[in-house]
From Swiss-Prot:
Pfam families assigned: Cystatin
Role played: Thiol protease inhibitor. Has papain inhibitory activity in vitro. May be involved in immune responses against invading Gram-negative bacteria.
Subcellular location: Cytoplasm
GO molecular function: cysteine-type endopeptidase inhibitor activity
Identification of the protein by name: Cystatin-B
Listed PANTHER family: CYSTATIN 14A, TANDEM DUPLICATE 1-RELATED, CYSTATIN FAMILY MEMBER
Protein keywords: Cytoplasm, Immunity, Protease inhibitor, Thiol protease inhibitor
Annotated tissue distribution: Widely expressed. Highly expressed in liver and to a lesser extent in spleen, gill, brain, intestine, kidney, head kidney and blood. Lowest level in muscle.
Cellular-component GO terms for this entry: cytoplasm; cytosol
Example of a GO biological process term: cellular response to bacterial lipoprotein
Presence of the UniProt keyword Heme in the record: no
Induction statement: By bacterial infection. E.tarda bacteria causes significant up-regulation in head kidney between 12 hours and 24 hours post-infection and in spleen between 24 hours and 48 hours post-infection.
Protein family (similarity comment): Belongs to the cystatin family.
């Protein structure tokens, strides 16, 4: 399946690398949300290639609650760091991941 340049990929199941990325930005997500998460499990994600990579990740945060994160991973030549650049609250498992 081809992807439009700058478009987002088809959803994929989260793996260990995506979970590590989420664990890394969890404190920033908690600060943004104004609360602590006992559960913070990556479920699915999509990517968008820009001058780096945007990861749009569905996170289970307990009960039926989910959040969507946009995590930007810089190119290695720019340090390769991670940045939480967006967060959507009040999501469900069924809500599709879309650009935000």
């Amino acid at each position: 399946m081809s992807m439009m340049c700058g478009g987002i990929s088809a959803p994929l199941d989260a793996d260990e690398d995506i979970q590590k990325m989420c664990d890394n930005v969890k404190p920033h997500a908690e600060e943004k949300a104004g609360k602590k998460y006992d559960v913070f499990t990556a479920k699915t994600y999509t990517t968008q290639i820009v001058s780096g990579t945007n990861y749009f990740i569905k996170i289970h945060v307990g009960g039926d609650d989910h959040v969507h994160l946009r995590v930007y991973k810089k190119l290695p030549c720019h340090g390769g760091g991670l940045e939480l650049s967006g967060m959507q609250h009040s999501k469900s498992l069924q809500d599709p991941i879309a650009y935000f």
